[in-house]
Each structure stands twice: as C-alpha cells, then as structure tokens.
Amino acid sequence: MTTSNSPTPMHPVSIVSLGPGDPELITLKGLRRLREADRIYCPATSQPDGTLTSRAADILRALDIAPAIIRPFPVTMRDDRAAALADYSAAVRRIAVECAEGRRVAVTAEGDAGFYSSLGYISALLAERSIATEHIAGVPAFVACAASEGVVIAELTEETNILTTLSSADELLDRLAAGRSLVLMKPSRYASAVKEALAQAPADVAFHYFEHTGADATRAYYTCRRDEIATRRFPYFSLLIVRRE
C-alpha cells in the first residue's frame, strides 16, 4: 500500500459581492459560491459590549447559509486606517490557514467588492501570500437605488460622474451645466455643499435622495423634493442621483 505525499489542494478564495443588502439581489453565481464554501468570512463591527454585528452576516443568514460556517471578523471604523489594516491582516492569516487545510473559503462584501469596498485590502494581502482569488460581481447601491424608484441615471451619450467628495456647490452646478449626471456617494462628508446646490440649481435639475435603500426596509427613505432633502441629516447609508430631466 502506498501513501500519497501530494500537498493538499488549495482552492481560490471567492470574493463574493452581496449587493446592497436585499438578499434577493445577490447573483446566482455568488449564491452558488456561498453554498459551496466551507467557511465564509464577513466584516463586522465591534460593539461596546464586545459583541460583533455584521450586515453581511445578516444577509447570509437570510440566504439560509448555515451559521456554523460564518466567520465574522472585526474591522475598526476610524479615519486612521492603520487599525483597520491590522484587522484585515489578522483575517487574512486565519483565511490562509483555512486554505492550507484544503477548505473552500469565501469572503463577502456589501455592494460590489470592486466599487469603494475595503475588500481590496483583503485581495492584496491574499495575493502577497500567493493565494488566488475569484471576484464575483454584485449590484452597487446606487444602481439598486435608481431601480427602486425607476430613476434613469444616464441616457445615450450622457456622461456620469460618481463622486465621494465635493469641494463646493459650484463644483456640483458646473458638472451639471456640462451635461453630466451625478451620483453622490457618502454625502454626509459634504452635506453643506449639496444643500447649498439644492437652493441654487435650476428647476429642471432633479435631486433624487435615498437612505438605506435595499438594505433596511424599515429605514428606507426616498424623496425628490428639495425642501425635504434639505432637512435630512445624510446618514452614512445615503446617496443622491442628480441630473437634468
């Protein structure tokens, strides 16, 4: 009887994009990879009592993924990214062990993993360890928001700018005057500029404002009325689509 000394095969890590939060918006391929996985790692936030909360884990449970294979890992949420990078490094060390033992591992991202997602750090750290990855696309939040209200983002040759920062109301108005439609991500960072533009923009400019769309039905909010938008606080999970109509 011979004994094989061949190494344990190492499967590529699946980076699975979950979409904006509605479990039904995950792709069929993404769901298949989750069901094939032996371990699923998902980012989580540490609470004051030491527990971890994870929107990604909530989505996985809604998809009937076995809780026993879900592995939340804490990610520090601060402007100083050093602590978060340390958290990603710790998660990758755990993932590398799982891979070396022959397990199929998936890592999840809300929205799309290649669109303003911190999972780029995970992919880079895995590459440094020569661990292959497979990226599976997801529905970005702004696409889900537009679909939820039948909003057109762009047509024909219209240019679209996706912004996460804005220097002033004038910058927003200048982009509109150049014939561009705008997707304003993370508007809490520049709320004053947006609200100033609300008061100055021509009447044919539509401001579509969304909160928690596709993620939390109890908190989801939409309006295209400028006076209502001006009163909102622009929470973290908010965005606007702005264009001439």
Where are these regions (language model features)?
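A short acidic, often aromatic-flanked loop/helix-cap motif at beta-alpha or helix-coil junctions
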Residues: T76-R81, A141-F142, S168-D170, A215-A217
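Short gly/pro/ser/thr-enriched loop/turn and capping motifs at secondary-structure boundaries
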Residues: Q47-G50, P140-V143, A191-S192, A215-A217
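Class I S-adenosyl-L-methionine
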Residues: T2-E24, L28-A132, A220, P235-L239, ...
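General beta-strand structural signal in soluble alpha/beta enzymes
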Residues: C42, R71-P72, V107-A109, H135-G138, ...
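Short, surface-exposed amphipathic charged segments that create phosphate/polyanion-binding patches used
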Residues: A84-A91, S148-V151, R175-G179, A220-D227
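A polyampholytic, Gly/Pro-enriched intrinsically disordered region
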Residues: A90-V97, V152-T164, R226-S238
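Class I SAM-dependent methyltransferase SAM-binding "motif I" and its flanking Rossmann-like core
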Residues: G111-A178, T231, E245
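A contiguous loop/helix-start segment that scaffolds small-molecule binding in enzyme catalytic cores
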Residues: V13, L176-E245
